[in-house]
Amino acid sequence: YGCMEFGTMEDDYRELRIPKIVRWAASLWLQGAIKDTGYEDVESYWMRKDVKALTEDEKNNYSPLYYIEKNLTKENSPDILIWHGDADLDVPYLQSERLNALLTRIVGTDKVEFKLFHNYKHAADQLYSDENLGILKEYLDEKFA
């Protein structure tokens, strides 16, 4: 649901060619909360730290990818389902692609399923369609029933 690598989101947005003004407009609901905090971007606001000033060690301390790489093995991993929308302006889908790549390298493709939804935004209502909930139910029944 959130960022996987703090300090890389700006690079992701540039790679995806999503300008700041578009991201700003998409996150207007959050801008009021950020405005009076002294943080200049959403990522720093969520972290309550200026992510541009973090050292590599500090970034690792906050990175789920770092903990996954350090602690997860094929033997101790649960089955993992990753869904992300390619129109997400809050968390670039490249974050989930890196998560998927790391997980499949560590635990294998049989334990990780990744689906990128076309034109879905962050926490999009379409994720909760009858069709998608049916897919989710089938996945849970298959893996955990």
Segments the model singles out, each with a brief description of its role:
Residues 9-70:
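Mobile cap/lid helix-loop segments that gate and shape the active-site cleft of serine hydrolases
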Residues 128-145:
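Catalytic active-site module of serine/aspartate enzymes centered on a nucleophile-bearing elbow/loop
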Residues 1-6:
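Active-site nucleophile loop of the alpha/beta-hydrolase fold
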Residues 60, 89-98:
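Conserved alpha/beta-hydrolase "acid-adjacent" motif
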Residues 78, 104-123:
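Catalytic histidine neighborhood in serine/cysteine hydrolases
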Residues 75-76, 81-84, 88:
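Short beta-strand/loop motif that positions the catalytic acidic residue
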Residues 86, 96-110:
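Conserved loop-alpha-helix segment in the C-terminal half of the alpha/beta-hydrolase fold
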Residues 90, 118-131:
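Catalytic histidine-centered segment of alpha/beta-hydrolase-like enzymes
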